[in-house]
């Protein structure tokens, strides 16, 4: 039986290319999404065998979508697609629960291998990032983890995308007061004093594109 896959990437041309690649290899693409929120809704509906998420997506990034997936469908492994080779992105992805981490530049050759591995219950890292992960663990303790919770990252991403507090509340289904409270805690944790500083942090963490 063909492995059933959910694709999530905000660039339609990328999704089309990935879909063509996977269908050529005999996989079944059961859904396509342009952001993390759409991906989670489709995942609940289609219950794929494997989910492939872009790391940087609007409204809800791949990192937090992955973390949500571990609760929504704990048996469905997630492969993250990204251009980032820096260890902070890789470790954040693994902490979020990703089972695979594939560089977009290597997707044509490595995505199929990643899907096969995670579908069997294993993990997969693109060869180019494996060394970074090894070095990161050797240097364990030198780099602080992201101080923000998953919800705070979601709020931060929306703020960095230019959303008002009211718009953040609508997107996340929370009250305006709660959204404002999250914003205040984020600024306190990051010792930031303005939206520009929050945008810079979001870019550094790969939550939005520069």
Question: What do these predicted regions represent?
Answer:
Residues 35-38, 59-64:
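Acidic catalytic/metal-coordinating carboxylates
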Residues 12-31:
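Two-component/phosphorelay signaling modules centered on CheY-like receiver
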Residues 135, 142-178:
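Helix-turn-helix DNA-binding segment
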Residues 54, 82:
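Active-site residues of response regulator receiver
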Residues 187-210:
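Basic, Lys/Arg-enriched C-terminal extension of HTH/homeodomain DNA-binding domains
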Residues 41, 63-75:
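Short amphipathic alpha-helix used as the core "switch/output" element in two-component signaling
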Residues 46-52:
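Active-site beta3 strand of CheY-like receiver
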Residues 88-95, 99-154, 196, 207-209:
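Short, flexible helix-to-coil linker/hinge segments that flank and couple to helix-turn-helix
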